[in-house]
């Protein structure tokens, strides 16, 4: 697919950010996330160019002002001087239609250049958007945001606000985000910190495959008390464990890792529309290489791991506790357990509950939503809701050699799309 970027500009808030908001101090969680960008791609069958995208973005950035700023890593702050969000206009050459792209995982040409946070330079935009138009009248909108300041839930809040402003022309009350997490969990001297990047493996060439778990398959895999996401995760985890045994020539102990969105789950509730990072890593118990674990047991393990993670982090916003100490204690305990010997980590991220299919800029809802380019150091599977809403799409990221073997797994072949 030949994509030509025809224009790049910086979109600034329509009104200047007040002086008292110029320096946004990131939170303790923001401080210690993995350095990367989070990207989602939305596909629209019809997308007339009426100029509202840019205007509504400028209106929305008034409330989401850190996204128009620049990160100053030496100060752990965002300089909110309205430097602007990157806005790229592109066009697809030839007769490729948006509908031809549904189900395809190669999204890199539809997305802004990925900075991946390796340097986190003072000139790197925290928010980049690429609108790619097709001769059929359709378009894709790719939104890439720095994980240093936002998690996926925050990205959903931003997309809801921007699309609402575009669709209504500002005729309804805007979605107002809260940036109070930074004051509730302020950043802390680095000597007390946790470097999530040190927990990552080596960089590798990544291949991506999409698995589709349709409603009928999920019904077969689940019971009334089992979520479809966990059942799909269990199938993939079982295949990855078999793959790990093949590549290492032996069974290894393993754990399953999954971030938990703690909004609405803390003893003291987080602010409404809380933006920033509010996701915490949960781990299953360590499973011995000698244990034979089936799909049903894996479903239970994953559920237990999530419940344990929620219990461990529930008091992070309590006024009589220093939430940062809770985070340090839990994460250090988990890291010590996982890395005390050779352990295989199976990693999942659940995006299925986010409302990407509700993002209507005034042209109707997306006909599909996809995951932007990832650079995991190890395996990573992102779970997405299918367009119909009753199925699960799994975007599996593995190194290229492992992916060749993964695709040959008998169970996985049933779900390759």
From Swiss-Prot:
The keyword Ion transport does not apply. GO terms for biological process: anthocyanin-containing compound biosynthetic process; pigmentation. The active site is at residues 147, 360. Expressed at higher level in recently opened, fully pigmented flowers. GO terms for molecular function: acyltransferase activity, transferring groups other than amino-acyl groups; anthocyanin 5-O-glucoside-4'''-O-malonyltransferase activity. It catalyses: 4'''-demalonylsalvianin + malonyl-CoA = salvianin + CoA. It comes from the Eukaryota. InterPro entries: CAT-like_dom_sf. Its EC number is 2.3.1.214. Inhibited by the following metal ions: Cd(2+), Cu(2+), Fe(2+), Hg(2+) and Zn(2+). Activity is strongly inhibited by CoA-SH and partially inhibited by acetyl-CoA, caffeic acid and bisdemalonylsalvianin. Keywords: Acyltransferase, Transferase. It is an enzyme of class 2 (transferase). Catalyzes the transfer of the malonyl group from malonyl-CoA to the 4'''-hydroxyl group of the 5-glucosyl moiety of anthocyanins. Anthocyanins are ubiquitous colored pigments that are responsible for petal color. Belongs to the plant acyltransferase family. Monomer. This is Pelargonidin 3-O-(6-caffeoylglucoside) 5-O-(6-O-malonylglucoside) 4'''-malonyltransferase. It comes from Salvia splendens.
């Amino acid at each position: 697919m030949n994509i030509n970027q025809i224009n790049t500009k910086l979109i600034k808030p329509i009104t200047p950010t007040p002086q008292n908001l110029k320096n946004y101090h990131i939170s303790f969680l923001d401080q210690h996330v993995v350095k990367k960008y989070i990207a989602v791609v939305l596909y629209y069958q019809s997308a007339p160019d009426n100029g509202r995208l840019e205007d509504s973005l400028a209106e929305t950035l008034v409330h989401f002002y850190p996204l128009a700023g620049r990160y100053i890593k030496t100060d752990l702050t965002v300089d909110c001087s309205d430097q602007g969000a990157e806005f790229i206009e592109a066009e697809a050459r030839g007769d490729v239609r948006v509908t031809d792209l549904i189900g395809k995982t190669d999204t890199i040409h539809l997305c802004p250049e990925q900075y991946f946070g390796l340097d986190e330079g003072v000139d790197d935009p925290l928010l980049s958007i690429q609108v790619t138009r097709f001769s059929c009248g359709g378009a894709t909108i790719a939104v890439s945001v720095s994980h240093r300041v936002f998690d996926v839930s925050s990205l959903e809040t931003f997309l809801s606000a921007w699309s609402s402003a575009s669709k209504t022309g500002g005729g309804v009350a805007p979605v107002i985000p809260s940036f109070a997490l930074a004051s509730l969990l302020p950043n802390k001297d680095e000597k007390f910190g946790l470097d999530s990047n040190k927990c990552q493996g080596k960089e590798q060439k990544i291949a991506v495959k999409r698995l589709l778990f349709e409603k009928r398959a999920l019904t077969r895999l689940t019971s009334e008390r089992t979520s479809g996401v966990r059942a799909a995760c269990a199938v993939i985890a079982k295949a990855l464990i078999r793959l790990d045994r093949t590549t290492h020539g032996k069974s290894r102990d393993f754990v399953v890792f999954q971030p938990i969105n703690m909004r609405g789950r803390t003893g003291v509730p987080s602010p409404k529309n809380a933006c920033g990072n509010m996701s915490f890593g949960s781990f299953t118990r360590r499973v011995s290489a000698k244990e034979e674990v089936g799909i049903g047991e894996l479903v239970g393990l994953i559920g237990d791991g999530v419940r344990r993670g929620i219990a461990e982090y529930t008091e992070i916003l309590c006024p009589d506790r220093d939430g940062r100490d809770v985070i340090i204690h839990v994460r250090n305990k988990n890291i010590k357990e996982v890395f005390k010997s050779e352990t295989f980590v199976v990693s999942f991220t659940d995006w299925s509950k986010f409302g990407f299919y509700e993002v209507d800029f005034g042209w109707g809802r997306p006909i599909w939503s996809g995951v932007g380019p990832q650079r995991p150091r190890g395996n990573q599977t992102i779970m997405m809701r299918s367009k119909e809403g009753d199925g699960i799409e799994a975007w599996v990221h593995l190194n290229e050699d492992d992916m060749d073997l993964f695709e040959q797994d008998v169970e996985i072949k049933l779900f390759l799309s």
